[in-house]
Amino acid sequence: MLKIIIPTMMLMPLTWMSKPNMIWINTTAYSLLISLISLSFLNQLGDNCMSLSLLFFTDSLSAPLLALTTWLLPLMLMASQFHLSKEPLTRKKLYITMLILLQLFLIMTFTATELIMFYILFEATLVPTLIIITRWGNQTERLNAGTYFLFYTLVGSLPLLVALLFIQNNMGTLNFLMIQLWAQPLPSSWSNTLLWLACMMAFMVKMPLYGLHLWLPKAHVEAPIAGSMVLAAVLLKLGGYGMMRITVLLSPLTNFMAYPFMMLSLWGMIMTSSICLRQTDLKSLIAYSSVSHMALVIMAILIQTPWSYMGATALMIAHGLTSSMLFCLANSNYERTHSRTMILARGLQVLLPLMAAWWLLASLTNLALPPTINLIGELFVVMASFSWSNITIILMGTNIIITALYSLYMLTTTQRGKYTYHIKNIKPSFTRENALMTLHLMPLLLLSLNPKIILGPIY
């Protein structure tokens, strides 16, 4: 594990010691190297886990998320170069340091062996994210967004700490590997219901569940590009990861308690997809589509069958790469037209034909077209929910249709139509941006050749 953690820590002195013209090249190259090293964790044997030390372990659930986290840092650095070009040197270095610190916390969160350590690191990821949003966001509303983000996630996760201390008292350990062997069945009673809610609420807010999702569109819209990317791609997955880990402790009770939350996520999935159809703001549309995809994941995790777990893991990885790519595309539009309003930046296909190709591919990935892993994840989830209850097929079908509608709506509004007068003389697409899109799409297409490495612990 140290072969990833120590190089990530060493990226910080590298950032501060690099020459001004070498900062981006150095950090991007070295972080890409770290992400290539982390791919070795994906090659794991069956359902056993690698206990790397007393503090860290990886298994087939945390390894794909670990690889996703490390893969994202070089992409964030590549995406941020343009909008930081006018910033003073110290501020650039501080920004990169924040991103590296966030990656460090995320890696340790996904591989922590012990639940209290997991909780501390889970909370620690808030700090760099908050600084990135409130310091480098575009509009003045970023402070409001930061407050929303902080309070929603903190209020949601404070009961979790109390619940964890209570479990520690009862069981004597919070080690993930021990818990699987020692977990006592949890009968339904008032106190256990509260315990269940305390354990799950933190992750439900983080996912976010429909109704607790108000912080997400705000945070996404106000964050700079790297903030949006890491928020959509990795921070939402912390919720899913935590839920999958902690359901071991709450085994029989979840069967009774999950119903209202499943209904809420099924309903929310359709609601947020419908909200996407009437968005005028491009980033806001992508943020709401994230909520709708994560509702599928919540649904899958609460069904608690091997198939649904596999679907949830695959969907988390697929969504991480897809939404990150969509945010990059939205940002490349924003850098040229200086507006996120879709009406003002239409007809770009004539001016940026290669970008239009990337937009098409990203939209098709978002609506789960066959060769991508988005389809594999969604198929698993749809089948699992159908075998749980036949009626869900109506809701799932509706959701899939609306998803296709808003993806194509997003594509046609930004690419088709007559372009507006003020964007005649925009810059062409850079090699940097094309490389960025390629690095997002490559894993999505390659993983469809061998999806079993991201299907989680059951496969």
UniProtKB/Swiss-Prot annotation:
What is an example of a Pfam family matching this protein? Proton_antipo_M
What Enzyme Commission number(s) appear in the record?
A: 7.1.1.2
The UniProt record lists the keyword Mitochondrion: yes
Transmembrane portions of the chain: 22-42, 60-80, 98-118, 147-167, 194-214, 224-244, 256-276, 284-303, 308-330, 350-370, 391-411
- One cellular component term from this protein's GO annotations in UniProt: mitochondrial inner membrane
- The top EC class, named as a word, is translocase
Catalysed conversion reaction:
a ubiquinone + NADH + 5 H(+)(in) = a ubiquinol + NAD(+) + 4 H(+)(out)
Topology of this chain in the membrane = Multi-pass membrane protein
Q: How does it assemble?
A: Core subunit of respiratory chain NADH dehydrogenase (Complex I) which is composed of 45 different subunits.
Role: Core subunit of the mitochondrial membrane respiratory chain NADH dehydrogenase (Complex I) which catalyzes electron transfer from NADH through the respiratory chain, using ubiquinone as an electron acceptor. Essential for the catalytic activity and assembly of complex I.
Family assignment from sequence similarity: Belongs to the complex I subunit 4 family.
- State the protein's name: NADH-ubiquinone oxidoreductase chain 4
